[in-house]
Every structure is written in structure tokens, then in C-alpha cells.
């Protein structure tokens, strides 16, 4: 899957002799889900290395700062990255990242935090990999309904209604 994403980003197919330098910046590497995702990503890149595609990856932690993430993208591009994977700190503020990448013709794969549609239309080398937020919300709602039906203890005041439900997401 990783090689397909990288191929999709380029104007040409990646050949076995190409070197792929991937720059990754995450909003917060202390996030458990992101940590696991990065482990899997690195395993996939190691698999590509074993199969003749030379890959290098540099991972940066923005630690919740959009300014830091913007600077990291510049550093990664200046270091020679030919593809960026960005987990945005602020999904509504990717313009500086997009502008720098576009200026240097480095495609961006946004992951897990989807930029707004208007930003995704800024350039034809922007991609998003992740869940459909609306679908995730619907699934959370369906799971909550099923749990309530299966466990009457959830209705604490026994009036047949749930007064308060918290669903978390972006």
C-alpha cells in the first residue's frame, strides 16, 4: 500500500533503482494511535527496502504546535524529501505547508486529520488517507445505540432515555 501511495504522488512510477526519502510530521507522537500507525508505516518501508526499493524516513513530532510543524516541513524539504506525510496539528491551517511543498514540487499525503476541502483543491499533488469523519460519527452513534439496547444498566435513572452521550472526534 505504501508503494502505491508513493507511486500515486509522483509523475512517474517508482522503479527499483529510485531512492524514496519520506518526511513525516505528526501533530503529537504521544498519541497512541499515531504511535502504532508510525510503527506499521516503518515496517512497510523496511519491507520495501528488502524488496529493492531504497527508502529513508525521517519522522518529526510537532508536539501540538502548527508553527513547529510548518518549520519541520521546510526542514524536511530542504533535507531532500521527495514526499511528505503530514498529520496536521490544525486541519484548518495547512496553507503554509501546501505553499512550501508546491514551491518545491513535493507531494503531500495528509493522514488521519483531513484538511478542509478548499485546501485540498489548492494543488493536484495533495492526497488524504484516513477515515471518513461522517461515517465514523454514524458508526459511533450506532455502537452507542447497540450498547444501550444490550445493557439496561447504562440508563442510570431507569426512565428509558439517555440524557447525555459524549462522542469524541474531530
Regions found by a protein language model. Name each.
Residues 1-7:
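Sec-dependent bacterial lipoprotein signal peptides
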Residues 8-170:
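A residue-level marker of the well-folded mature domains of exported/periplasmic proteins
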